[in-house]
Amino acid sequence: MPTSKNKKKSNKSTKNKNKKNKKEGFIQSHSLFIRAILLFGGFLSLINVGFMYTVANPTIGFTLQAMISIALIFYAIFFKNIPKKIHVLIVILMIIPLAFSLFLGFYGNRNDVDYTEDVVIVLGAGVNGTLVSRPLAHRLNAAVDYWNSNPDSLIIVTGGLGNRATITEAEAMSRFLIWRGIPEEVILLEDLSTTTYENLVFANEIALEHFPDGFQGVLITNDFHIYRSTRMAQQIGVDVRPLGATTDWYSWPVNYLREMLAVLNFKIFE
C-alpha cells in the first residue's frame, strides 16, 4: 500500500513530466516556426538575386547573397540536428552583416552640404548600353536637386566604359543630366576611371584645373557607398562633403553585402 511520501513523489514526478512535455512542445512549435521563416527567407532571397540579375550589373554581392540564401535553406532543413553552440555561432554570423549594414545606412543618410560648394562630384555606377542604371539615376537626381539649389556649382560626372555599356558612364550621366535640364556647360566629364579610387583621383585633377587655389566639393553616391568613398576622399586629400542618394529597397542585400566586403578590403589595405 503506497504511503503518503510515495504519493507526493509520484505527484511531483508527474508534474515534472508535464512541465517537460510542455517545454518540449513549446520548443518544437517554435522550432517549426523558425524553420518556416528561414525557408521562406532563403527562397525569397534567391528570387531577389534572380530579379537583380535582370536589372543590374552582376557583382560579388550577387554571389554572396545567393550563397547566404542557400545556406539559410539548408539551415532550415537541418535545424533540429544542429548543436546549440552552432546555432549561437550562426546567429552571431547573421547579426554581424545586419549591424554593419545598419551602420552604413545611417552613415550614408548624412547631408553635410550647405549649398555654397564649388564642385559636385557624382560617382559612376552601372550603365546598360547607353542608359544609366537605377542606382546611378538616383545619384544623378540628387545632383540635379543640389544644382537647382546652387546653380553656380560645376558638376563632374565620373566613370569609364563598363561591361554592359556602349558608352562611358560619364557620357551616359552627362546625357541624363542634360535631359533633366542641367546646362551642358556646367557638366565636366571624367571618363577614364574604373574604380571608386580612380573616380576621386581623376575628378580631383579636373576640379583643380578650374579651381587651382582649391575647392570645396560635394560627393554624391548611394547611401551604402558614402562611408567608403568619403574615407577614400580623405585619404587622397579631396575636400568633399557627403550627400547620400537613395537606394531601392529590393537592391539592399546585394549592395550592402558587396559594400561590406569592399569596406573590409579598404580597411585592410588602406
Task: Give the location of each predicted region.
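N-terminal targeting leaders characterized by basic, low-complexity, disordered sequences
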Residues: 1-26
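Membrane-interface helix-boundary motifs at transmembrane edges
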Residues: 27, 77-90
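Perimembrane helix-loop junctions in membrane proteins
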Residues: 52-55, 79-82, 104-112, 270
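A transmembrane-helix-recognition feature enriched in membrane-embedded lipid enzymes
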Residues: 252-270
